Swiss-Prot record:
Family annotation (InterPro entries): DadA, FAD-dep_OxRdtase, FAD/NAD-bd_sf
Record protein name field: D-amino acid dehydrogenase
Gene name linked to the record: dadA
Pathway assigned to this chain's UniProt record: Amino-acid degradation; D-alanine degradation; NH(3) and pyruvate from D-alanine: step 1/1
UniProt subcellular location: Cell inner membrane
EC number(s) on file: 1.4.99.-
Membrane topology: Peripheral membrane protein
UniProt-listed GO biological process terms: D-alanine catabolic process
GO terms, molecular function: D-amino-acid dehydrogenase activity
Residues at which FAD binds: 3-17
Length: 432
């Protein structure tokens, strides 16, 4: 089957890889000059299934009001009055109760755990290298309340069979030695030993080369104007004076998916702006061993080979990509506070990107009412964590194979009022 994939970020490229491996003739189209040039370029580097959780959580509405008056707030909102922004925010607020939070986190962890299995299988099969580490993730708590609240997430982890360690502050240095100097500022941490890290852009670029060698065609510097449709199917992709045709089409345009699908499929994917710093390491023993998640500021600090990646924050500001100095100051403040000897902060590279976020936090993966249009978008801050699983899942569904995990509550159909999901089962291993 001829398949066109729109988008060459980590989700688009993994989709191309798995579809090609399933025997399809795949073409990837992107406006950029190469893969992973936008949202996948400089994310936090975490592959953290256990921390997969929606931003829509109990208490967030009240916290958002408090954050409006804080200098280093993890979330910022600038209302633009557009119906899309207001509707998306209202949908997000409706998911900020315990029932929705547990439901959304459960399916996010399910897909994320499966995705890590798929990544391990892919890594073993291809030998791909991307400065990856398998050292686990450590979520740091600065207050007693945060430490106590961890029990809510632990319940989801136990239900999904995810190993964890709840550590008091005196034990944090056992897994991250550099924290010994600052442990007095912390109340404890939640460690997930099976989590991983890696450079998402490096992975995507190298997998794209492997996919190209396997027969995938990449059409870079090719802006897409619109999808052409008639009745119940797509019949082409209009790119300037050219119409590119295929048997099936996969939307993986991230934050730009919603506009491209206007009038075809209504999906609530909104750009959630985030920032990162990439810092050269100066003292290896003063840098993190793996990856840290600061619960207070919602900022991740990740170790690559010779660099530290500091990423986080969320701004609901539309498609604005300005680099704001106060956000840089927040990232610098957190990394100086936790790893003061780690890196040359004054030499850091400052970056921003737009994460494609749904109001319930769960990506949109699967079929649509158009028989040859498929979606793989809306992964929010977890595109790197969920990419391989989403790509394998999409390939299985499109190819008529039975996926290894339940998936109907990942489709766009879940936004229908009459949708009733199949009860999820325990996680299965990835395909051999």
């Amino acid at each position: 089957m001829r398949v066109v994939i729109l988008g060459s970020g980590v989700v688009g490229v993994t989709s191309a890889w798995y579809l090609s491996q399933a025997g399809h003739d795949v073409t990837v189209i992107d406006r950029e000059s190469g893969p992973a040039q936008e949202t996948s370029a400089a994310n936090a580097g975490q592959i953290s299934p256990g921390y997969a959780a929606p931003w829509a959580a109990p208490g967030v509405p009240l916290k958002a009001i408090k954050w409006m008056f804080q200098r280093h707030a993890p979330l910022a909102v600038r209302l633009d009055g557009t119906p899309f922004q207001l509707k998306w925010m209202w949908q997000m607020l409706r998911n900020c109760d315990t029932r929705h939070y547990m439901e959304n986190k459960g399916r996010m962890v399910r897909l994320a755990e499966y995705s890590r299995d798929c990544l391990k299988t892919l890594r073993a099969a291809t030998g791909i290298e991307y400065e990856g580490r398998q050292g686990g993730t450590l979520q740091l708590f600065r207050t007693a309340q945060q430490y106590e609240n961890a029990t809510r997430d632990i319940a989801v982890l136990e239900d999904a069979g995810v190993p964890y360690q709840l550590l008091e502050s005196s034990r944090l240095a056992e897994v991250e030695p550099a924290l010994a100097e600052v442990a007095h500022k912390l109340t404890g941490g939640l460690r997930l030993p099976n989590d991983e890290t890696g450079d998402c852009q490096l992975f995507t670029q190298r997998l794209a080369r492997m996919a190209e060698q396997a027969g995938v065609t990449f059409r870079f510097n090719t802006p897409v104007e619109k999808l052409l449709y008639e009745n119940d199917q797509i019949y082409g992709v209009k790119c300037a004076d050219e119409i590119i045709k295929a048997d099936a089409y996969v939307m993986a345009f991230g934050s730009y998916s919603t506009a491209m699908l206007k009038g075809i499929v209504d999906i609530p994917v909104y750009p959630l702006k985030g920032y990162s710093l990439t810092i050269p390491i100066v003292e290896p023993d003063g840098a993190p061993v793996s990856t840290i998640l600061d619960e207070t500021y919602k900022i991740a600090i990740t170790r690559f080979d010779k660099r530290i990646r500091v990423g986080g924050m969320a701004e609901i500001v539309g498609f604005n990509t300005d680099l704001l100095q106060p956000r840089r100051e927040t990232l610098e403040m957190v990394v100086r506070d936790l790893f003061p000897r780690g890196g040359h902060i004054e030499q850091a590279t400052f970056w921003t990107g737009l994460r494609p976020m749904t109001p319930d936090g769960t990506p949109v993966v699967g079929r649509t009412r158009y028989k040859n249009l498929w979606l793989n978008t809306g992964h929010g801050t977890l595109g790197w964590t969920m990419a391989c699983g989403s790509g394998q899942l999409l390939s299985d569904i499109l190819s008529g194979r039975t996926p290894a995990i339940p998936y109907d509550d990942l489709s766009v159909a879940r936004y229908r009022s009459d949708f009733t999901p199949t009860p999820p089962q325990r996680l299965h291993s990835a395909h051999n």
